[in-house]
Curated annotation (Swiss-Prot):
Protein name from the UniProt record: PTS system fructose-like EIIB component 2
GO BP term (any one): fructose import across plasma membrane
Organism domain of life: Bacteria
Subcellular localization, as worded in the UniProt entry: Cytoplasm
Predominant location category: cytoplasm
EC number of the protein: 2.7.1.202
Residue positions of the active site: 10
Gene: frwB
GO molecular function: kinase activity; protein-N(PI)-phosphohistidine-fructose phosphotransferase system transporter activity; protein-phosphocysteine-D-fructose-phosphotransferase system transporter activity
Alphabetized UniProt keyword annotations: Cytoplasm, Kinase, Phosphoprotein, Phosphotransferase system, Sugar transport, Transferase, Transport
Keyword Transmembrane helix belongs to the record: no
Length: 106
C-alpha cells in the first residue's frame, strides 16, 4: 500500500494549515493510500511524524510557504513541495501527480 506523509504550515499558522492537512488526507484516502499529516500551526506541532512514519513513507509532501521545522528528517526521501493554497484547493491533482510519479518509478 502506498504511504504518503505530509507536513503543512502557513504564515499565520491557523486555518490554512489545518484545511490543507484535511484536504491532503481526504485526497490520499480516496486513492486508497495510507496517509499521516503533521501540522505545524500556531499551537505548535500536532500529529508529529515519527522516525518510523518517515522511514516507511513512499512520498513526502511539504508546504513551501514558510519553512518546515525539522525538515532534515526527510533527507533521502522523495519530496513534493506545494503551496498551501494548492494543498487546500488542488489536493486531488497533487495526488494524481504523485500517483503518476510512483507508477514511473515502480
Amino acid at each position: 500500500m502506498t504511504k504518503i506523509i505530509a507536513v503543512t504550515a502557513c504564515p499565520s499558522g491557523v486555518a490554512h494549515t489545518y484545511m490543507a492537512a484535511e484536504a491532503l488526507e481526504s485526497a490520499a484516502k480516496a486513492k486508497g493510500w495510507e496517509v499521516k499529516v503533521e501540522t505545524q500551526g500556531s499551537i505548535g506541532l500536532e500529529n508529529e511524524l515519527t522516525a518510523e512514519d518517515v522511514a516507511s513513507a513512499d512520498m513526502v509532501i511539504l508546504t513551501k510557504d514558510i519553512g518546515i521545522k525539522f525538515e532534515e528528517r526527510f533527507a533521502g526521501k522523495t519530496i513534493v513541495r506545494v503551496n498551501i493554497s494548492d494543498a487546500v484547493k488542488r489536493a486531488d491533482a497533487i495526488m494524481s501527480k504523485i500517483e503518476a510519479h510512483l507508477a514511473q518509478t515502480a
